[in-house]
């Protein structure tokens, strides 16, 4: 839970803000042409600029600027007419230059918002607008590997891989508008969804393409001043974000109710133990001694360029969800699932455009197709079973040519190889039996070999009709028209 009640002073309220670091999916780093490929041998994607060697000068990757501006536009941020880069000074082994190029007082974008749908356990889903303070560009640091432990404490020694150093980041800073762990997780999920729709990042949390730091405090009542803020790191899933928030809220409440003070610090989420651990005291901005980077000029994006980039933005997830509900009559749940991944949404729309009924398409995509795609770790964009073929199969079912059972039988082959469902049905004689005379003959044969069941049915055990339906389907290989079969069975059983 995320709210606790103090017996003396009433309800506690959590105040949560997120700093989301999004790796921008450019082929080269933010200030140099070094590769950004993930997973290669350590320290194979570094160069003099990354290492800050004497005589080297950074040059801004224009694609980074474009991606950052598009991300800002999608988050309803105001794009700055003038921005600049600054040096953030601190000393740590993963920072080869002993400073990080970031943006301090003049970021590329400020003052935006997104709306998220929040489904709290035991409550109705609600829509919440979350303010976004800023988006700024910066370079990523390297990665430390601690031998013998997953953190510095307890390790025998540490290794550093600078392949990640210099990779472009867009840091998105929310306002402290979140109140529960669930809201924080939904906000982070929507940020990733938007970035993926834009194509500016793959948002893969396991590879560090999207990382979230949570700032959290508690206060007694919505009108009380903010409490002491604690930063939480090391959460590599949306579930971890929610659980870390929920744990930290309760920890801080217990500290206050014991008459003690919450320490301003950075803590790590321990997934194994399901708790947060103290890491270090929290620095303030003055500790970093920011100053403008003398090697990089100011950034000014012409209005015509900005509008050109705005015209390239796709329909975003929230707008697509709303349209699916309005245009296709889908439920809020169906619209949310279908728009979760851009390739899935495109697949759905292509199948509907091919003539199939939207709800039928939605059911197949969310069921059997989603299971296959997830199990095989592929995308809908590379699925052999193309959307127009799914549309054909749905139309065969709706038109009464095949049953859902037959569709499920031929689907594994279609998912593996693709092809025309109608052609497979015709070649194998799988078309539905919808001739009343043919079904009547089969029904009469079944009644003749099951006289006891017929007598029991006529004696009041009407549920036995499902037994006869099952026998009929077994005898016809599932090809009998279910509606027609039930009608004929009902008539014959009643005598």
From Swiss-Prot:
Species the sequence originates in: Prochlorococcus marinus (strain MIT 9313)
Reaction catalysis annotation: L-glutamyl-tRNA(Gln) + L-glutamine + ATP + H2O = L-glutaminyl-tRNA(Gln) + L-glutamate + ADP + phosphate + H(+); L-aspartyl-tRNA(Asn) + L-glutamine + ATP + H2O = L-asparaginyl-tRNA(Asn) + L-glutamate + ADP + phosphate + 2 H(+)
Gene for this chain: gatB
Cross-referenced PANTHER family: GLUTAMYL-TRNA GLN AMIDOTRANSFERASE SUBUNIT B MITOCHONDRIAL AND PROKARYOTIC PET112-RELATED, GLUTAMYL-TRNA(GLN) AMIDOTRANSFERASE SUBUNIT B, MITOCHONDRIAL
Subunit-level organization: Heterotrimer of A, B and C subunits.
Family: Belongs to the GatB/GatE family. GatB subfamily.
Record-level GO BP terms: glutaminyl-tRNAGln biosynthesis via transamidation; translation
Keyword Amino-acid biosynthesis assigned: no
Name of the protein this chain belongs to: Aspartyl/glutamyl-tRNA(Asn/Gln) amidotransferase subunit B
Top enzyme category: ligase
Function: Allows the formation of correctly charged Asn-tRNA(Asn) or Gln-tRNA(Gln) through the transamidation of misacylated Asp-tRNA(Asn) or Glu-tRNA(Gln) in organisms which lack either or both of asparaginyl-tRNA or glutaminyl-tRNA synthetases. The reaction takes place in the presence of glutamine and ATP through an activated phospho-Asp-tRNA(Asn) or phospho-Glu-tRNA(Gln).
GO molecular function list: asparaginyl-tRNA synthase (glutamine-hydrolyzing) activity; ATP binding; glutaminyl-tRNA synthase (glutamine-hydrolyzing) activity
PROSITE patterns, sorted: GATB
E.C. numbers: 6.3.5.-
Keywords assigned: ATP-binding, Ligase, Nucleotide-binding, Protein biosynthesis
A Pfam family recorded for this sequence: GatB_N
Recorded superkingdom: Bacteria
InterPro entries from the UniProt entry: Asn/Gln-tRNA_amidoTrfase_suB/E (IPR017959), Asn/Gln-tRNA_Trfase_suB/E_cat (IPR006075), Asn/Gln_amidotransferase (IPR018027), Asn/Gln_tRNA_amidoTrase-B-like (IPR003789), GatB (IPR004413), GatB_C_1 (IPR042114), GatB_Yqey_C_2 (IPR023168), Gln-tRNA_amidoTrfase_suB_CS (IPR017958)
SMART domains reported in the protein's UniProt record: GatB_Yqey
